[in-house]
């Protein structure tokens, strides 16, 4: 008997065998129902982390189960391969981004294969490969032709020393460049946008269709889209034909407007500024350009502003009111202007107080009076005062009435506004998809002809981290003839946001080797939508929202038939590791430096350390390398621990002892099968014509496991309880002593079949040791036999005066009278009822009998 379970040998053997047999190749049998299981693809950083392992293992279990249940399953993997880290590597290490990325992909692909993940590698996509980004550019042109891709000026982070644009993550908490240390400036550049706001209403409304998504993700998206209903109102500029448009959710307060505020970047700002105020205004604009958007809008930051000297007319009151600019108003939000109602908005109140602006109360509490001196803004609904013909109206009715009045007068209209802004996709980087546009002085922006796609990234580039992007400096690549007029022109030197690449990759998997189109609509109709998408909650907004937007645009371009890409979404929790932190200094301590981990103290100061679980990271010294776990315990143990430790959607706390526990469990399964073989057991033995009580009990345990695990997988993927059921079944088989019985044979076969999606290698090995043909992963998923689930006997609890006194076994078919009699005449009944008068007997069928006694006097 081979008692030794050697995961390294077994796993390498079967991974090689599965690859040779192409076991994981996508089944395209049209007679089978389809199932598309997808994990969010990774950025190829070079190494897997435990968050990856958890995500991919969960999806792999789902995919393997669905195959065994008779589905044809699409379960692909690829690489979100463009991005800033590769360009940084080029600057720091002198290695080309393409080479660095390819090396990392090779390393990570090997790690994924070691986990036994059942990917169809023939459908692998890599977003930095020309075969992929050719179609990313093709899709950009679809947006351009639909009027959904356009250019406008937008602020970027500018390093004045290196003379280059910085990503947000390259700016530290003090607003300095990561490389030069210079204070970062905000500078306006002409950049490309996608008009996601054109789909804001549909993106919001269609959230209701996503019944398979977590409610919190839908709420996060709804808040990000941020629908507000109110009125658009116009304030004429005194001495000009132009007007300042504002959006407000409180048109009932318009009679209380005592000033208007423009964003410093607003095109009207300098137009309304008087000559006397110009220097002050320009200096203020320059100072605001040094502030990030977060700084400008933070609630705890002072609201700075200056008067322009210009005036606007409040058409409702006929008053001239001052026009200010302020740092808290952003041009990208709404109209880039707000009306100041200090009596009824707390921010306006603080601003008016700071700058001695008039405060006029126009709403009072329903049962109150106007305050002679407001100490704070009154922001609740109430009754209108100082509001002309609308005096006395309640504010809810006044919102409607004032909006209708403004519409009739030509001063405004009812309006719905969204917090969502158009998607800025320009990146002043090399390692991204070149935007397929050529700028011609005569023709303007001209799309690159589709026959000339892809616009390839040039190989011979210099990476310095200084000056314009590498593409902008490469004249041989940049300077080209205009496709329209043939005159001298220049390529667009910005590349696309990497979120573009991940906004359509799930379509490409359905037809990954198509060289004539991004995908065949027939393939999309066959596989989409994704039936189960799995990824982290950190992608709840941007990636998922952009993917939904892309899907709707491609639908409107008649390229796909679906309106939503992902039918069900599972957001797995984080993997957390134990950290040791000095609460006084906030510094983390490396565990290997701590003498006693049970009573940890700082090796430098002797202070007691705080032990908490936090997201794994290098800086906290709490990471666990998947490769180390696989080397010590095997991939199956790593998978089982990841699945067992916590429900998929909850955070998981890494515990070496629990990893060891799963390794012991797989060893028990191994020994169980070796004992079964040694005792003469074999697969496929027929069930006995008549079952003993022990066989009935074992068969009930077998089919209970089938029922419970199937329900766990069909429902909310409670894979942790599914693993617990596997352990129960293993224990039931270990306790039974009928190795040559057909029931035991059924139990071993069921255990291995149910275990296969969770621990694929050991299941395959033991299956073949027992003479199983084909792969265990091609066996049908077992179905629970309802007759086997019915017990011959049940446990009947006996209570006296509501107190449990014990339990007995009775026939499952016993009548109420038989239950009463059995309980009364049992040893327990005789002990507690002797000499007592029974007043009443309460029977809960199948559960308990309660004897109510006459009270003794």
Curated annotation (Swiss-Prot):
It is found in: Cytoplasm. ATP binds at residue 618. Disulfide bonds: none annotated. SUPFAM superfamilies: Anticodon-binding domain of a subclass of class I aminoacyl-tRNA synthetases, Nucleotidylyl transferase, ValRS/IleRS/LeuRS editing domain. GO terms for biological process: leucyl-tRNA aminoacylation. GO terms for cellular component: cytosol. Its EC number is 6.1.1.4. It is an enzyme of class 6 (ligase). Keywords: Aminoacyl-tRNA synthetase, ATP-binding, Cytoplasm, Ligase, Nucleotide-binding, Protein biosynthesis. GO terms for molecular function: aminoacyl-tRNA deacylase activity; ATP binding; leucine-tRNA ligase activity. A motif ('HIGH' region) lies at residues 42-52. Its main location: cytoplasm. It catalyses: tRNA(Leu) + L-leucine + ATP = L-leucyl-tRNA(Leu) + AMP + diphosphate. Transmembrane segments: none annotated. A motif ('KMSKS' region) lies at residues 615-619. Pfam families: Anticodon_1, tRNA-synt_1, tRNA-synt_1_2, tRNA-synt_1g. Gene3D superfamilies: HUPs, Isoleucyl-tRNA Synthetase, Domain 1. NCBIfam families: leuS_bact. Belongs to the class-I aminoacyl-tRNA synthetase family. This is Leucine--tRNA ligase. It comes from Thermosynechococcus vestitus (strain NIES-2133 / IAM M-273 / BP-1). The lineage of its organism: Bacteria, Bacillati, Cyanobacteriota, Cyanophyceae, Acaryochloridales. The gene is leuS.
């Amino acid at each position: 008997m081979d008692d030794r379970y050697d995961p390294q040998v077994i796993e390498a053997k079967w991974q090689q065998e599965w690859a040779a047999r192409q076991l994981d190749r996508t089944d395209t049998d049209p007679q089978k129902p389809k199932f598309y299981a997808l994990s969010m693809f990774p950025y190829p950083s070079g190494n897997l982390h435990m968050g990856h392992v958890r995500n991919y293992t969960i999806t792999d279990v789902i995919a393997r189960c669905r195959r065994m249940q008779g589905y044809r399953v699409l379960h692909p993997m690829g690489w979100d391969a463009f991005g800033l880290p590769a360009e940084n590597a080029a600057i720091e290490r002198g290695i080309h981004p393409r080479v660095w990325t390819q090396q990392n992909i090779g390393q990570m692909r090997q790690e994924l294969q070691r986990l036994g993940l059942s990917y169809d590698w023939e459908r692998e996509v890599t977003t930095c490969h020309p075969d992929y980004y050719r179609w990313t550019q093709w899709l950009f042109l679809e947006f351009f032709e639909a009027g959904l891709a356009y250019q406008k000026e937008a602020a970027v982070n500018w390093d004045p020393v290196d003379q280059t644009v910085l990503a947000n993550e390259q700016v530290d908490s003090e607003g300095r460049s990561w490389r030069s240390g210079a204070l970062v400036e905000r500078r306006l550049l002409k950049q490309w946008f996608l008009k996601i706001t054109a789909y804001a209403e549909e993106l919001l409304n269609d959230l209701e269709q996503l019944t398979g998504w977590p409610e919190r993700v839908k709420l996060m998206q709804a808040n990000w889209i941020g629908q507000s209903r109110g009125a658009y109102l116009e304030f004429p500029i005194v001495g000009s034909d132009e007007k300042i448009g504002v959006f407000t959710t409180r048109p009932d307060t318009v009679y209380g407007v005592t000033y208007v505020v423009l964003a410093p970047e607003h095109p009207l700002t300098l137009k309304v500024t008087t000559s006397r105020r110009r220097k002050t205004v320009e200096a203020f604009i320059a100072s605001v350009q040094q502030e990030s958007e977060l700084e400008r809008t933070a609630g705890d930051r002072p609201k700075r502003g200056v008067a322009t000297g210009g005036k606007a007319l409040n058409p409702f009151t006929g008053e001239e009111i001052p026009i200010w600019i302020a740092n808290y108003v952003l041009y990208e939000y709404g109209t880039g202007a707000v009306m100041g109602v200090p009596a009824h908005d707390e921010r306006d109140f603080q601003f008016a107080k700071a700058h001695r602006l008039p405060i006029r109360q126009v709403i009072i509490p329903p049962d109150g009076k106007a305050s002679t001196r407001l100490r704070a803004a009154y922001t609740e609904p109430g009754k209108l005062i100082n509001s002309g013909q609308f005096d006395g109206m309640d504010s809810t009715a006044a919102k409607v009435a004032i909006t209708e009045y403004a519409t009739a007068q030509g001063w405004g209209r009812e309006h719905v506004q969204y917090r969502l802004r158009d998607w800025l996709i320009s990146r002043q980087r090399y390692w991204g998809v070149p935007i397929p546009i050529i700028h011609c002085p005569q023709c303007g922006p001209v799309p690159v002809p589709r026959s000339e796609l892809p616009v390839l990234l040039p190989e011979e580039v210099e990476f310095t981290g200084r000056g314009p992007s590498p593409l902008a400096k490469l004249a041989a690549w940049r300077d080209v003839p205009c496709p329209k007029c043939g005159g001298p022109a220049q390529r667009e030197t910005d590349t696309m946001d990497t979120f573009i690449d991940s906004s359509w990759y799930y379509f490409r998997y359905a037809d990954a080797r198509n060289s004539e189109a991004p995908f065949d609509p027939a393939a999309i109709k066959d596989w989409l939508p994704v039936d189960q998408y799995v990824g982290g909650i950190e992608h709840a907004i941007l990636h998922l929202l952009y993917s939904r937007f892309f899907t709707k645009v491609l639908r409107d371009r008649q390229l796909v038939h679906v309106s939503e890409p992902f039918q069900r979404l599972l957001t797995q929790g984080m993997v957390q590791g134990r950290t040791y932190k000095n609460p006084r200094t906030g510094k983390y301590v490396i565990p290997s430096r701590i003498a006693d981990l049970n009573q940890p103290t700082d090796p430098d100061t002797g202070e007691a350390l705080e032990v908490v679980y936090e997201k794994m990271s290098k800086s906290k010294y709490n990471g666990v390398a998947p490769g180390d776990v696989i080397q010590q315990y095997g991939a199956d143990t790593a998978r089982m621990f990841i699945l067992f430790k916590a429900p998929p959607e909850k955070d998981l706390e890494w515990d070496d002892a629990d990893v060891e526990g799963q390794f012991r469990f797989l060893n028990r399964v191994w020994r169980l099968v070796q004992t079964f073989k040694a005792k003469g057991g074999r697969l496929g033995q027929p069930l006995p014509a008549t079952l003993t009580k022990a066989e009935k009990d074992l068969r009930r345990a077998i089919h209970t496991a089938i029922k419970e695990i199937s329900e766990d997988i069909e429902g909310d993927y409670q894979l942790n309880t599914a693993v617990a059921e596997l352990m129960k079944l293993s224990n039931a088989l270990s306790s039974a002593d009928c190795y040559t019985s057909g029931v035991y044979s059924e139990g071993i076969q069921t255990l291995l079949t149910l275990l296969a999606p969770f621990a694929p290698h050991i299941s395959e090995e033991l299956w073949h040791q027992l003479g199983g043909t084909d792969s265990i992963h091609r066996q049908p998923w077992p179905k629970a036999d309802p007759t086997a689930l019915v017990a011959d006997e049940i446990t009947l609890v006996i209570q006296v005066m509501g107190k449990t006194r014990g339990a007995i076994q009775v026939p499952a078919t016993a009548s109420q009278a038989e239950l009463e009699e059995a309980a009364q005449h049992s040893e327990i009944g005789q002990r507690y009822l002797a000499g007592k008068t029974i007043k009443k007997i309460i029977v809960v069928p199948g559960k308990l009998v309660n004897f109510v006694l006459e009270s003794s006097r």
